[in-house]
């Protein structure tokens, strides 16, 4: 029978090991991403030109100077060619913003002997790694409710810092679900957690987040024990996060029913996600983190491609 | 009490609690094991589930069994179980006669015998019956029935006797006792030996009483008999009473002071008799005075040896030279044949310049000169001194002796001789007269067929009769003897071959020689210093006991009532003269419990209707602590198992368990291969190679760089040695003094690396042994650059001091300029290596004698076992094949490399040739060369 344990509260806090793990994973992922690029060959990432003048790097057009404008904006080289004054306009370029949320509730501290690491470690590593990957690709990443969108190179350290500060300040248990604030249109959300809350709450949360048209991805981190229910004999189950105990005389008798309920729970979440055009990825801590990262990246890219198309449509 | 098992309980009532076990079984069965606590995040999903079968799983049957066994153990332990509880003897119905075989055969199990007898006497006391304890050794003493308490006291005073008693005498006493008290109960505690009377005794007591119980130990009885000191070794017969029991064992040989000299193993191989052999040098064999079977405490298992069992070493010189061509014509042939059974004969090598002296140097106790006429001056003096010091000189007449004259004869001889029965004589060959009382040959039968046809004659001086040991029927002496100093000169007036007499063909000849040889110990003891020629009684009429064995085989003062044995007594021990030594010290005669050809046989008592009881050997064993320990272990196992089942035993993970199983397996399987290895300890090919070729060796320090330089240095030195000297050494080898055998290497180079750990104690001990056995170790501290004279010791010096702590290092001195090591091949001043400033320390030579004869080279008695230098010799030697030094030298130069190599050559030559070069033979050459 596999054994399971909860991490100590202290041990579960965001720390150096998560930064290190995330950076290593992202590094490793660069090699994996060669394969990923072939899958998503058509998808480009980075800064996306908006086909109109605005803040950006690349040249868009020269336009005549309008009096009242700041003189500093005059492009003197072009203006010297004739008598008129020109202003150099650049194409408006905007990066996508991805909001990341990492569940740090008590149930995430669960780890069994079948798992490679506790769920929270896996979630933090995944979240920080995807942030690093995005920033290196030119996108902006934000920790939902904690940081503004950032594109600094040291995104992992910044995020980790923000997480640690919140953990140090927070007096109560972190929530199992993020606050239902609407995300801006065009933004994407990456929610990493075990999503063991009631499907109705999850559905409400998704709807709240996507109220302004944001898309999102749920990454469900589960322990292999939660998937397979390999218990036998006289066993007393102790709730994690939720109060309650359950004494099973013969644990193996619960297995089939539990597995059915788990599948139903998943299906409910997936339905809620699909309704808002969100995606759901199930990741087991018994598997390496790269799997989840690859899947998540592909989904992010396809989503941003779709988003770009959606944004271009009104222009053309 | 269980009849079939020797198991009893102190409180049998407690066993009733065992009935509660089924109840416990039910209780345990319905109490489930403690649930495993399992945190489970998706617990919400489980709420409200109602599985079909949710009865708690029950305690597994094996755990139940374990607990029941633990409880059963406890209950049985509380009942006070006793294994082998002493059972009460049956109470006798009539007066009880306890007949106790108390010969030596009963000694090994005496305590149990006494305890069995006591048990019966106790029973008799309880039933208020009179009793008698009758030891067999008591013989036909009248049996009086007394109070069992008194009988017990008497029993406790009994000790096993060193001889076997006469049972028939006891049976008579029993018969007469039975006439007075009818129908006695008889208990016979027998030793199981049938020494001629067991069957009859059994029948007779069976006739007396209908209630005969016999207790026998069933033990196999071992004994020694008939030790013989043969030419090849000392042989002793080992006997046992039954062809059962352990077939192998050890006979130990002890000397007079009780020190162990040797052990010999024996193996019965199913038979009842075998032989143990001590193949020792004769000097050691002659020291043996007592043989005993190890682990067998009885007088029968002890064999005492006296002077008669010693073998003498006899030097034999004969005048003949071509003995081997016609052996029957040579006197030595007859002498060898006659003496070989009881003495070792040494003959001088054919090439020996002076056979007499060489044999005397061989520590012969008796010298026999067969017809040797003239003994040369030096040999004569040596012989005279030999006789003065207690040796026996036996001479045989012959043509040489008849024509010569010397004073190493007991009586003056008439020149010429006397021929009887020859063509020119008128008398028939004479026969021997019976021996006189004063003669050591007294008592030997004189066979009729011995005739003497020729002899040398003694001058009829006064006192000749006293010197005569044997004479012809007409009174002319044939054997004369005279004391000289502490020794004895014996002259046979006839030859040792058959030309003058047929005495050498008779058994008398052997007996006479034997008597003479027996005298040798006496004379060498030097007990008395009688003047030459004085008559003396060679044997006392009777020998008083000096020390006797008790029943357990220990020597002690003889008990009262032991009678002296007559002189010449050679039978086995009897009650009136138990085994032991008789006679004065130095001349004592050993009497043993068993005669030389005696055997042991077990008695058989089938068909007599005796009740037989075994002699209980093992005492009662209280099983309580064992059972409690077992219960404790079982409960501990139960606790561990319960913990494991509820998942709280983390460390008892499968991996750990597998490790434990492997470890157990390794422990169980481990010793087998190692014992196989020790069985066949082969010589490693490396040792074989080292033994076949002389090679230089170095101690691997473990520092790779240093070891490589050392190896290169020794290779270079070996190359130079092969090129310049007659020594062609093999490739140098690295040795580990702790592991490798060092004795193959004359020279061991040991570079000191202070950073390496000290070698184990065994390595230092082996190095010390190597130095003791004549090896030389060159310690090179390689620190000549860092060391300052008078300054603190360098780390290397400290390391070396640590190493040599506890090693017996001789006194050292700086290499003196005239030390032989500086002259053995080249003339050098110092051992130079990579550096030149260091001093070589070597074993201090004896100081120059005060008369001051200046010698160019001095040497001690042996090679210095240790040389300590700091010049890094190996680095100085190391060169490439073309002779270029591999390392930069300090101060440097081609010359220094050459001098270093020369020092190395000298060093090797010194260890191989020792002080040879200090010989005066070379002094002139050395002086000449020193003058240049």
Locate each region found by the language model.
Chain A
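Exposed, interaction-prone extracellular/peripheral surfaces
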Residues: 2-51, 59, 64-72, 78, ...
């Amino acid at each position: 029978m596999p054994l399971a344990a909860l991490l100590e509260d202290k041990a579960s806090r965001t720390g150096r090991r998560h930064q290190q793990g995330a950076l290593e994973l992202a590094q490793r992922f660069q090699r994996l991403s060669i394969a990923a690029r072939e899958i998503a060959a058509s998808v480009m990432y980075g800064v996306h030109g908006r086909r109109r003048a605005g803040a950006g790097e690349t040249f868009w057009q020269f336009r005549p100077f309008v009096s009242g404008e700041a003189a500093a904006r005059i492009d003197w080289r072009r203006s010297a060619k004739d008598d008129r004054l020109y202003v150099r306009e650049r194409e408006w370029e905007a990066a996508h913003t991805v909001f990341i949320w990492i569940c740090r509730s008590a149930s995430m501290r669960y780890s069994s002997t079948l798992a490679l690491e506790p769920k929270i470690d896996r979630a933090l590593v995944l979240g920080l790694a995807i942030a690093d990957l995005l920033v290196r690709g030119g996108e902006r990443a934000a920790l939902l409710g904690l940081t503004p969108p950032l594109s600094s190179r040291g995104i992992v350290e910044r995020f980790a810092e923000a997480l640690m500060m919140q953990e140090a300040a927070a007096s109560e248990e972190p929530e199992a679900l993020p606050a239902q604030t609407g995300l801006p249109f065009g933004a994407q959300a990456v929610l990493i957690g075990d999503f063991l809350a009631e499907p109705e709450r999850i559905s409400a949360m998704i709807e709240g987040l996507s109220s302004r048209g944001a898309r999102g991805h749920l990454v469900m981190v589960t322990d292999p024990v939660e998937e397979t229910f390999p218990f036998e004999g006289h066993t007393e189950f102790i709730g994690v996060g939720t109060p309650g105990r359950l004494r099973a005389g013969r644990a193996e008798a619960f297995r089939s029913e539990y597995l059915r309920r788990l599948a139903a729970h998943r299906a409910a979440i997936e339905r809620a996600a699909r309704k808002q055009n969100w995606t759901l990825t199930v990741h087991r801590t018994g598997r390496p983190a790269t799997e989840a990262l690859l899947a998540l990246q592909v989904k992010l890219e396809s989503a941003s491609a779709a988003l770009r198309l959606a944004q271009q449509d009104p222009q053309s | 009490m269980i009849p079939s098992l020797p198991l009893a309980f102190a409180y049998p009532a407690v066993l009733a609690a065992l009935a509660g076990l089924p109840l416990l079984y039910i209780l345990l069965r319905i109490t489930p094991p403690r649930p495993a606590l399992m945190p489970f995040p998706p617990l919400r999903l489980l709420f409200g589930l109602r599985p079909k079968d949710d009865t708690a799983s029950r305690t597994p049957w094996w755990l139940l069994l374990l607990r029941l066994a633990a409880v059963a153990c406890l209950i049985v332990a509380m009942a006070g179980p006793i294994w082998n509880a002493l059972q009460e003897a049956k109470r006798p119905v009539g007066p009880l006669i306890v007949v106790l075989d108390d010969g030596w055969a009963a000694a090994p199990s005496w305590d149990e015998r006494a305890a069995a007898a006591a048990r019966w006497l106790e029973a008799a006391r309880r039933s208020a019956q009179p009793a008698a304890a009758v030891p067999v050794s008591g013989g036909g003493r009248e049996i009086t029935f007394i109070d069992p308490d008194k009988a017990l006291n008497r029993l406790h005073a009994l000790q096993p006797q060193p001889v076997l008693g006469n049972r028939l005498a006891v049976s008579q006493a029993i018969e007469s006792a039975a006439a007075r008290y009818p129908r006695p109960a008889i208990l016979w505690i027998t030793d199981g030996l049938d020494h001629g009377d067991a069957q009859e005794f059994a029948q007779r007591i069976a006739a007396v009483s209908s209630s005969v119980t016999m207790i026998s130990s069933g033990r196999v009885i071992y004994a020694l008999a008939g030790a013989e000191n043969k030419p090849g070794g000392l042989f002793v017969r080992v006997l046992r009473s039954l062809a059962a029991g352990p077939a192998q064992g050890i006979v130990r040989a002890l000397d007079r002071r009780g020190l162990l000299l040797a052990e010999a193993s024996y193996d019965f191989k199913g038979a009842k008799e075998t032989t143990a052999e001590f193949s020792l040098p004769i000097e050691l064999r002659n020291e043996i005075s007592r043989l005993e079977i190890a682990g067998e405490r009885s007088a029968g298992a002890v064999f005492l040896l006296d002077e008669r069992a010693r073998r003498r070493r006899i030097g034999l010189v004969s005048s003949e030279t071509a003995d081997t061509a016609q052996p029957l014509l040579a006197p030595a042939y007859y002498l060898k044949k006659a003496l070989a059974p009881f003495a070792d004969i040494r003959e001088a090598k054919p090439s020996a310049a002076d056979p007499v002296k060489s044999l005397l140097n061989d520590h012969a106790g008796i010298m026999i000169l067969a017809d040797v006429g003239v003994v040369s001056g030096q040999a004569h003096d040596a012989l005279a001194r030999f006789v003065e010091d207690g040796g026996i000189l036996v001479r045989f007449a012959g043509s040489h002796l008849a024509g010569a004259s010397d004073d190493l004869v007991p009586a003056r001889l008439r020149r010429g001789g006397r021929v009887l029965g020859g063509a020119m004589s008128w008398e028939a060959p004479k026969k021997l007269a019976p021996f006189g009382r004063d003669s050591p040959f007294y008592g030997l039968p004189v066979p009729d067929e011995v005739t003497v046809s020729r002899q040398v004659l003694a001058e009829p001086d006064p006192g000749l009769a006293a010197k005569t040991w044997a004479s012809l029927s007409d009174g002319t002496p044939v054997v004369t003897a005279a004391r000289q100093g502490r020794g004895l000169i014996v002259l046979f007036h006839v030859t040792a071959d058959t030309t003058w007499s047929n005495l050498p063909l008779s058994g008398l000849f052997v007996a006479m020689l034997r008597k003479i040889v027996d005298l040798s110990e006496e004379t060498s003891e030097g007990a008395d210093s009688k003047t030459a020629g004085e008559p003396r009684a060679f044997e006392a009429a009777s020998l008083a006991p000096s020390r006797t064995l008790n029943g357990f085989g220990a020597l002690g003062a003889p008990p009262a009532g032991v009678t002296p044995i007559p002189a010449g007594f050679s039978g086995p021990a009897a009650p009136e003269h138990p085994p032991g030594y008789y006679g004065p010290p130095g001349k004592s005669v050993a009497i043993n419990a068993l005669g030389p050809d005696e055997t042991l046989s077990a008695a058989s008592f089938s068909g007599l209707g005796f009740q037989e009881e075994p002699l209980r050997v093992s005492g009662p064993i209280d099983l309580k602590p064992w059972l409690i320990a077992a219960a404790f272990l079982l409960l501990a196992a139960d606790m561990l198992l319960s913990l494991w089942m509820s998942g709280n035993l983390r460390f008892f993970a499968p991996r750990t368990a597998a490790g434990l199983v492997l470890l157990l397996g390794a422990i169980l399987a481990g010793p087998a291969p190692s014992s196989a290895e020790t069985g066949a300890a082969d010589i490693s090919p490396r040792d074989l190679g080292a033994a076949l070729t002389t090679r230089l060796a170095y101690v691997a320090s473990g520092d790779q760089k240093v070891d490589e330089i050392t190896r290169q240095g020794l290779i270079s030195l070996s190359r130079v040695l092969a090129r310049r000297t007659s020594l062609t050494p093999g490739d140098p080898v690295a040795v580990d003094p702790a592991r490798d055998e060092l004795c193959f290497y004359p020279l061991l180079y040991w570079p000191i690396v202070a950073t390496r750990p000290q070698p184990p104690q065994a390595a230092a001990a082996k190095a010390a042994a190597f130095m003791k056995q004549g090896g030389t170790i060159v310690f090179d501290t390689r620190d000549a650059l860092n060391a300052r004279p008078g300054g603190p010791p360098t780390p290397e010096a400290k390391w070396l001091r640590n190493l040599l702590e506890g090693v017996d290092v001789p006194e050292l001195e700086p290499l003196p300029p005239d030390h032989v090591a500086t002259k053995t091949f080249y003339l050098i001043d110092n051992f130079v290596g990579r550096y030149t400033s260091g001093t070589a320390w070597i074993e201090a030579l004896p100081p120059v004698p005060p008369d001051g004869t200046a010698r160019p080279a001095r040497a001690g008695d042996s090679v210095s076992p240790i040389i300590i230098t700091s010049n890094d010799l190996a680095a100085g030697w190391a060169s490439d094949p073309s002779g270029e030094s591999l390392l930069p030298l300090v101060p440097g130069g081609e010359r220094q490399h050459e001098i270093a190599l020369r020092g190395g050559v000298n060093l090797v030559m010194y260890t191989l040739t020792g002080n040879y070069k200090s010989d005066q033979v070379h002094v002139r050459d050395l002086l000449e060369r020193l003058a240049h």
